[in-house]
Regions:
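Short, low-complexity N-terminal intrinsically disordered segments enriched in polar/charged residues
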Residues: 1-38, 53
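A solvent-exposed, acidic/Ser-Thr-rich amphipathic alpha-helical stretch
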Residues: 13, 32-85, 100-103
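A short hydrophobic beta-strand element
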Residues: 85-95
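Short beta-strand segments enriched in hydrophobic/aromatic residues
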Residues: 39, 95-97, 125-128
Length: 129
């Protein structure tokens, strides 16, 4: 078994933070094509949403494309990127959104893995407090 002996290598944290901010921009503008590129194209990818669960890339695509075309803007309160070795990372986020004039706080967690085609989200969860 190969042990992970590098945590939070600064160059990887910067790379993943930059990628995450591109993901966030795509999410907030509801750019589904870009969002699809960030997720692992596999039947094994999982996304737990606010009111729904998706199992597999196709379920995630169907969900994203069925949402109304409104913007999902939110304020990032706390973003944490932790890398493990050269090829895996956890990205966690606390955020604030206004929905129908009501302030809501939420959180999101994602596991990212590096594949030959680049970094991909392999598991994601989002919820409100």
């Amino acid at each position: 078994m190969q042990m992970i002996n590098t945590v939070n290598e600064s160059a990887l944290v910067a790379e993943l933070t930059e990628l995450y901010m591109k993901y966030e921009a795509a999410l907030c503008s509801n750019n589904t094509a870009v969002l699809d590129e960030f997720f692992w194209d596999s039947a094994d990818v999982v996304r737990f949403g606010l009111k729904e669960n998706q199992y597999g890339a196709e379920d995630i695509r169907v969900f994203r494309n069925s949402r109304p075309g409104f913007k999902l803007e939110r304020e990032i309160i706390n973003l944490k990127v932790v890398t493990f070795g050269q090829d895996s990372a956890a990205v966690t986020l606390e955020f604030r959104r206004f929905i129908n004039g009501e302030q809501r706080f939420g959180r999101q967690s994602q596991m990212w893995m590096r594949f030959s085609e680049g970094w991909k989200v392999v598991s994601a969860h989002v919820s409100f407090l």
